C-alpha cells in the first residue's frame, strides 16, 4: 500500500512537531534489555569494572534529559557542569575525571569521536531513538500518518 504524499501544510506541521519533539528532554529512556551485551560496553566493563558501566548509564540518562540531547564541553564551564551532573550517590566528579571518562567513551565508540573532538558529547544511538520517537509523535499529530524510514539526523552533524 503506497503512502500518500503530505500536503505542504501537513509537511510544515510534521516538521514543526518533529523539531519541537527532538529538542525536548525525554521523560523515558528506551534501551534494549540486552544493552549490557553491546561489544563496546562489554569491553569497557571488562577493562574498567562495573562502576564504568554505571557511570555510562548515568551519562545516558543525562543526555536524554537535556534538550538537544548533548553536552557542550568546549570550555572549562562545560566540563564543570558535566562534573556536577555526573556527581551522584555521594560521589563527586571533577572536570578532569569527566574528561578522562569521556575520552575513554570516545575510544570505545560509545560517544561520537568527531563531535567529542569538537567539544560536544553526543551518542548517535540516542539521537536515532529520539528521531524515531519524534517522527512517531509528528505522524500522530497528522492523525496517524506514518513517516518513511529514518532519514538520519543531519542537524546533529552540522
Model-derived segments and spans:
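Alpha-helix C-capping/helix-to-loop hinge sites
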Residues: 44, 62-66, 85, 89
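Short helix->loop/beta-hairpin flanking segments within DNA-binding domains
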Residues: 47-78
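Winged-helix/helix-turn-helix nucleic-acid-interaction surface
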Residues: 1-40, 73-81, 87-158
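Surface-exposed beta-strand edges and their flanking turn/coil or helix-capping segments
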Residues: 43-44, 58, 69, 134-138
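Short, mixed-charge amphipathic alpha-helical segments
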Residues: 37-50
